Amino acid sequence: MASEQRWIPLESNPKVLNKYVHNLGMDAGWNFVDVFGLDPELLAMVPRPAAALVLLFPDDKETVNQLIGEYQSDYPDSLYYTKQTIGNACGTVAIVHALANNENVIPFDAAKHFKTFLEKTKPLNPEERAKHLEQDNLMGAAHGDCAQEGDTQAPSQDEHVKSHFVALVHCNGTLYELDGRKEAPVVHGTTSADTFLEDAAEVVKKFMARDPEI
């Protein structure tokens, strides 16, 4: 990574993620929840509408480099995409991708920091957005506070964790995988607000076929 800055990794835990995003100003009526399986009866347990899916998977270079989907370098301006330059910040980058691409769906408190962060970074390109996050002390502090809130002991910021967060989002009828370490957003076909969760589940199945440890 271009930056030597490192954060403490986030735990994949809805309680942790919800405290984080609600402190940043996401409406309390919206929450992260666990998805317990990809079968229709388990997906039916997920509250609707589902605005985004955050996926955590083993960070194995041999499998991660096997691209699923196709890069789209000429993606629409309405898709918010940022690079990741902070070590262990993939949880926050996935959250930013999930929230920023649902600004028209999820209310945000204008007095809280995420709304300000979004307004400042929307005009920037992905590299500039990453640089802004590096320098945003409030985002860093919010991440650090919640990284200590998990059910397991938080690793040190210097630890190289063997897992990675990405976000799956819907934008203009297309399902995108947003990963700040990749060269561009990855397209996974068409979707809609009504079918997003089921379509995203099909993408997750492809991840699982690539890496059975997921």
Curated annotation (Swiss-Prot):
InterPro entries (alphabetical): Papain-like_cys_pep_sf, Peptidase_C12_UCH, Peptidase_C12_UCH_sf, UCH_AS
GO cellular component terms listed in the entry, alphabetical order: cytoplasm
Catalysed transformations (reactions): Thiol-dependent hydrolysis of ester, thioester, amide, peptide and isopeptide bonds formed by the C-terminal Gly of ubiquitin (a 76-residue protein attached to proteins as an intracellular targeting signal)
Keyword field contains Nucleus: no
Annotated EC: 3.4.19.12
Tree of life domain: Eukaryota
Active site per the UniProt annotation: 90, 164
Site (Transition state stabilizer): 84
Ranges for domain UCH catalytic: 6-214
Enzymatic class: hydrolase
Compartments, record wording: Cytoplasm
Cystines in this chain: none
GO BP terms, alphabetized: protein deubiquitination; ubiquitin-dependent protein catabolic process
Keywords, sorted A to Z: Cytoplasm, Hydrolase, Protease, Thiol protease, Ubl conjugation pathway
Gene3D superfamilies for this protein: Peptidase C12, ubiquitin carboxyl-terminal hydrolase
PROSITE patterns (UniProt xref): UCH_1 (PS00140), UCH_DOMAIN (PS52048)
GO MF annotation: an example: cysteine-type deubiquitinase activity
Residue numbers marked as site, Important for enzyme activity: 179
Role this protein plays: Ubiquitin-protein hydrolase is involved both in the processing of ubiquitin precursors and of ubiquitinated proteins. This enzyme is a thiol protease that recognizes and hydrolyzes a peptide bond at the C-terminal glycine of ubiquitin.
Family: Belongs to the peptidase C12 family.
PANTHER family registered for this protein in UniProt: UBIQUITIN CARBOXYL-TERMINAL HYDROLASE
Name the UniProt record assigns to this protein: Ubiquitin carboxyl-terminal hydrolase
